[in-house]
Amino acid sequence: MISVIFALSVAQLFLGMADLLQRGVRVRFFLAHSLWVINLFLLTFLHWWSLWTFRELSWNFGMFFYGLIGPSLMFFACTMISPRNTTTNDVDLSDYFLRIRKWFLSIFAVLLVFFSFDGPLFGTEPLLNELRIVQLSIVAISIFGIFSTNRRFHTAASVGVLLILCIGVFIRFLPGQ
């Protein structure tokens, strides 16, 4: 079920982008928006892959329910990131992103908190490890973004999140980890 929700999340990202391109409207792209799409795509696969460590666990309903919360929030964030059913001939992704940023970044911060605690709650990793710095950094950037309407900040923040996610990949998935 968790994998299905992640697959639907990725499908939402693809559908959102394809919808913009197929409709024949003039799209004004915004680097921060494009990078957030990439960040969501990357985080979806990273978290899905990290769930491999739970394969030997004896699951109960509470664990399963908790395990569904993060992917469900991810699906919601992936659905929200791209405009749907626009009635105008012009789509400005900068304006759109700034309009949804409070909800989007709030959901993103909360889903990262849920992702941060599944390993410690399920007993597969300690509460404090190198990944918490990565996760807390992204949560902090998201919280700052909720309150900022500065386009440059959001571009820098989306680049920062991408770089931090890449650092997290090296921490989490290096051989021997």
Place the predicted regions along the sequence by residue.
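Alpha-helical transmembrane segments
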Residues: 1-4, 57-75
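Hydrophobic transmembrane alpha-helical segments in integral membrane proteins
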Residues: 1-9, 176-177
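Hydrophobic, membrane-inserted alpha-helices
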Residues: 114-115, 137-145, 162-165
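A generic, lipid-embedded transmembrane alpha helix
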Residues: 31-54
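Central hydrophobic cores of alpha-helical transmembrane segments
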Residues: 35-36, 155-167
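Membrane-interface helix-boundary motifs at transmembrane edges
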Residues: 19-33, 55-59, 87-97, 146-157
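Membrane-proximal helix-loop-helix units in multi-pass membrane proteins
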Residues: 67-136
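Juxtamembrane boundary at the C-terminal end of a transmembrane helix
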Residues: 167-177
